[in-house]
Structure formats: C-alpha cells, structure tokens
Amino acid sequence: MFSKVAIVGFGSSGKRFLALAKEALPASEFLVVTRRKSGIEGTEIASELGELEAFGPDIVVLTGPASTRAAVVRRIPPQTVGIFLEKPLEVSLAAGLELSIMLNRPFRVTQVGYNLRFSESLMKFRSMVQNQEYGPILGVRAETGQYLPSWRPDRDYRGAVSAKAALGGGVLLELSHEWDYLQWIFGDTAWVRAWFGKASSLDIDVEDSAHVTMGFESDEGLEVVAQVNLDFFRHDRMRTVTAICERGTLRWDGIAGHVDGFPEGTEQWESISRGSGIETTYKAQWKSFIRAIETASKPEVMLADGLEVLRVIEAIRLSHKNNGRQVAVDRSGVVL
C-alpha cells in the first residue's frame, strides 16, 4: 500500500525510524534526506529538499531540529497520506499554528512523536489515576533530569539540538514529553506559574532547568496542582511522576518502567507493574501510525496534541517573563 517512504534527518531518531519502517514495510522504496554522503546501505540518499518532492512519498517522517519543520512541510507533495513529526511540533506556538495550517489536509494522517504514551507502565499508571484506584488526586509531583553530555556520549553535546536555542533546544522543548503526558493523564492545563533559566556551567545557550506549577482543569470542580522540575544537569538520571491520592500514593518510574503504590494503612511501597523498556514504545508508536493511515482514523497523538504542548510552553514563557505570576493557558487560535 505504501510504496515510498521518506525520512528527513538522519540522527539517532532518523536511524531508528528508518529501521522501523524497513521492518514494517520491507517492499517499500526508501529515501533519506540528509547531508551525510555515506553510511546508509540500501537506501537512496538526497541532500536537497527538492528531491523529497520529486520522490513523491506516501509517508514522510520528519526528524531533526523543530526549527526546520516548515521548510520540510512546504516540500511534501499533496498525495502524501501520512506525516510523522518528531516532538516537539515546532519551536513556538505561533510557528506551530502556522505549521498546522500547512499540514491540515483531508485524508491525511499527521501524528506527533510523543512515544511515552505507548509505555506500558505509563498506561497502567494513567489507568489507575483516572479510575481513582487510590481515590481522588490531591497533588502531583513530576521530576525529570539527565546530565546533557551523557545523553549521546559518542558526540559533543555542545553541537546537539538540545544545546542550541536557534534549533529549538532547552528543557522546555527537549523535555516536552512531560507537558504532553501530564495532560494526557491529569487533563488540560488551566494555568501555570514558572521559572526557568541556566543554573549549571554547561556550554549551552538555552535554559538547563525549569520549575513549573501547573493547575489542571477538573470536571468535578476540584483543581489538581502539579509541581514539575526539569533539568539537563543531574547525574542520577530520573523520570518520575508521583500522584498523591486520598487513599495512598502512586508512583511511575519512567526509567525503570515501574509503577509502585503506597496504599493507606501500609508502611512500605508495593510493586504494581513492571513494564517493558522505552524501546518497545517506538515500535508501538510506529504500528499505531501505520494503522491510522490504513484505517483512515485519528492517530493516537494528533496534531492538536502537539499544539497543546506548545500552548503550555507559551504560558510558561509568559509566566517566567512576568516574574512567575500565574498565567492562563491560551486556547484561542484553534485551527483544527
């Protein structure tokens, strides 16, 4: 069904998607758009975006810096039926809204790469939270951090997207998984209070840490508030979400893939779930994308979800600019 697949960008993400696509669609013809001249066996290589248009792909996967999205999308032909964009969608809400207009075509599936929604352990945690298995949520704590030079030890961190403002780096965009899955679990963000900046000696021109308070909308009229801390400098790699509930506490460990509980009346944590690692999320994400195209259905992570992340980041930036005052998340300008 899909005879031509194009991958734009060939960093770690591009390599992963090419392998996934070749495994799932072995009979397809593949094109990789990259400045690299070699090292991609059995695949056509293009160095110019104009060659993408001439290739006429059925599916296009956009990896690389978020700042390059619009230039690539302008070259995608109308007959393309599936577009996958690595997260984040864009570098700002204004740019994201403009991009969404270009992408929003009938009979085309567009999915954004928030793969942690496909984590077995996070799905279990979300189910328990939403089913109130430990009672109503009283508070949320989220903590994510890793020493930036250790992300990709085979390359100089100073040249990475994460380290450069012009490419869409910094914790707000690079760790935007948190803004996506926290809303997926707890609901839309109503308001934020935020500070972010550079606290370490890392040789980067972006924020390396952010401390954000988020208020989530609730149908029951009870506001759920989360404290979120992100950074690029901690050596003990961490990704956790803790839900403090009326009848105990639930904790998700995204590094280990575990869910643990501390029920009321007990004195220790109990193991609830031991999920598979993050690698399985990429394959599940790709399968869901292909299935959405084949069935002409909505993808698991829609263009609107990518925009919602940018709305939260926009509010965070505005709050920081105004000395951490409370800022409502602006949902005007919806185009989807």
Locate predicted features.
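C-terminal helix-rich "cap/oligomerization" subdomain common to oxidoreductases
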Residues: 30, 59-62, 131, 217, ...
